[in-house]
């Protein structure tokens, strides 16, 4: 019998109770202790979680990258162990199960299971169901200086409790769902690691052949040494308020909006049309280069590049990437690239025919190297399975009525 068939048998005819999130959890907002008070951060032993913890260490966490001192805790009260953190502003929907007493920054809302429901739920079952909550959050945001979740609706989000009149069977069902999803998670992690290693090898191959193709003995190849300003036009994009950007494409928000590190969301109006390159202008990742075709909006944190006649835009993309423009960033708290400085950089420009030849070869490697969507699909599969399997609770119960 398959695992899903077994789960359906376990669920046969059971009732599902749907409870508002605020009835199941105590909600508390995170905060950042004052950075000016050194005693709040010196010799800290209390885990203080940020988005970086999830990005670097996953969704089930028992320690944090940064720690704070006990004197930094408001009212001396920590978030309890085995509670769930979910981001309700900025990068919305990211969540993690925290297995130790802790605190978090203001981007997170802590979901701590109420004592009255402590014996009714498996916290890991609720953690997996938060993938569905996360999707709801991303679709229900309010816009001000930055995106934030509609908290009134958030508190009303419904949580399923299978077989509410039989606590023992309810926990057995939840435990079985968790077991299946744990297996999905393990397989996902294994496959993701394999794919990431494969992509790393492809990247090394691409870099090697790119460097070989873009390195010339100038006396052996037709061409001239020029500055970037001689072969391309560079101009910073235009400022746009954060409240005019939404996360997903919909209705009149049809134009992708690019900042210094890639796409930020979608906007109503375009700033550019055609075939261009975008160079990240500000931030730790400034100097990254992307190709863009069609209609889009570029913010002031991106440099929009248009090539001159006699320059192949795909060759220019690979050349700029190989130049590692990040090395020319200002050494400050907020690294940045000056357009004027970029325009003065020199390089050897071969004939247009050789540019096209080089670009065609490197594009093939680039396609192989950047199969990141494959990894992204694998990483998101567990989230989809979490929602799909848990929703069997609802579907099976309805089919038996």
From Swiss-Prot:
SUPFAM superfamilies: DNA methylase specificity domain. GO terms for biological process: DNA restriction-modification system. It holds the Pfam family Methylase_S. Keywords: DNA-binding, Restriction system. CDD domains: RMtype1_S_HpyAXIII_TRD1-CR1_like (cd17281), RMtype1_S_Sau1132ORF3780P-TRD2-CR2_like (cd17266). GO terms for molecular function: DNA binding. The specificity (S) subunit of a type I restriction enzyme; this subunit dictates DNA sequence specificity. The M and S subunits together form a methyltransferase (MTase) that methylates two adenine residues of the sequence 5'-CCAN(7)ATGC-3'. In the presence of the R subunit the complex can also act as an endonuclease, binding to the same target sequence but cutting the DNA some distance from this site. Whether the DNA is cut or modified depends on the methylation state of the target sequence. When the target site is unmodified, the DNA is cut. Type I restriction and modification enzymes are complex, multifunctional systems which require ATP, S-adenosyl methionine and Mg(2+) as cofactors and, in addition to their endonucleolytic and methylase activities, are potent DNA-dependent ATPases. Contains two DNA recognition domains, each specifying recognition of one of the two defined components of the target sequence. The type I restriction/modification system is composed of three polypeptides R, M and S; the restriction enzyme has stoichiometry R(2)M(2)S(1) while the methyltransferase is M(2)S(1). This is Type I restriction enzyme EcoprrI specificity subunit. It comes from Escherichia coli. The lineage of its organism: Bacteria, Pseudomonadati, Pseudomonadota, Gammaproteobacteria, Enterobacterales.
């Amino acid at each position: 019998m398959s695992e899903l068939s077994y789960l359906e048998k376990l669920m046969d005819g059971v009732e599902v109770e749907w409870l508002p999130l605020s009835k199941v959890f105590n909600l508390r907002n995170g905060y950042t202790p004052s950075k000016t008070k050194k005693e709040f951060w010196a010799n800290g032993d209390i885990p203080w979680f940020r988005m970086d913890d999830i990005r670097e260490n996953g969704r089930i966490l028992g320690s944090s990258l940064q720690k704070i001192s006990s004197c930094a805790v408001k009212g001396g009260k920590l978030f309890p162990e085995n509670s769930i953190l979910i981001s309700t502003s900025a990068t919305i929907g990211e969540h993690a199960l925290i297995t130790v007493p802790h605190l978090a920054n203001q981007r997170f809302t802590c979901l701590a299971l109420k004592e009255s429901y402590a014996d009714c739920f498996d916290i890991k079952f609720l953690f997996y169901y938060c993938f569905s909550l996360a999707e709801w959050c991303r679709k229900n945001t309010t816009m001000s200086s930055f995106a934030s979740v509609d908290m009134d609706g958030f508190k009303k989000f419904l949580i399923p409790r299978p077989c509410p009149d039989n606590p023992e069977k309810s926990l057995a069902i939840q435990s079985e769902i968790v077991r299946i999803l744990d297996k999905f998670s393990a397989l996902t992690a294994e496959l993701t690691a394999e794919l990431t290693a494969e992509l790393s090898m492809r990247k090394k191959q691409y870099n090697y052949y790119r460097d070989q193709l873009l390195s010339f003995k100038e006396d052996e190849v037709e061409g001239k040494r020029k500055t970037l300003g001689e072969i391309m036009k560079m101009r910073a994009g235009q400022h746009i308020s954060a409240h005019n950007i939404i996360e997903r494409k919909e209705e009149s928000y049809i134009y992708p909006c690019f900042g210094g590190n890639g796409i930020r969301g979608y906007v109503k109006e375009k700033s550019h049309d055609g075939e261009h390159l975008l160079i990240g202008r500000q931030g730790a990742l400034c100097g990254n280069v992307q190709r863009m075709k069609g209609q889009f909006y570029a913010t002031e944190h991106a440099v929009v590049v248009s090539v001159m006649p006699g320059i192949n835009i795909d060759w220019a993309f690979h050349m700029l990437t190989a130049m590692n423009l990040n090395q020319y960033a200002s050494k400050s708290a907020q690294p940045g690239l000056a357009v004027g400085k970029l325009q003065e950089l020199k390089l050897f420009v071969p004939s247009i025919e050789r540019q096209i030849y080089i670009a065609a070869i490197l594009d093939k490697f680039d396609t192989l190297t950047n199969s990141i969507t494959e990894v992204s699909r694998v990483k998101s599969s567990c989230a989809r399975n979490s929602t799909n399997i848990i929703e069997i609770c609802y579907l099976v119960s309805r089919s038996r009525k």
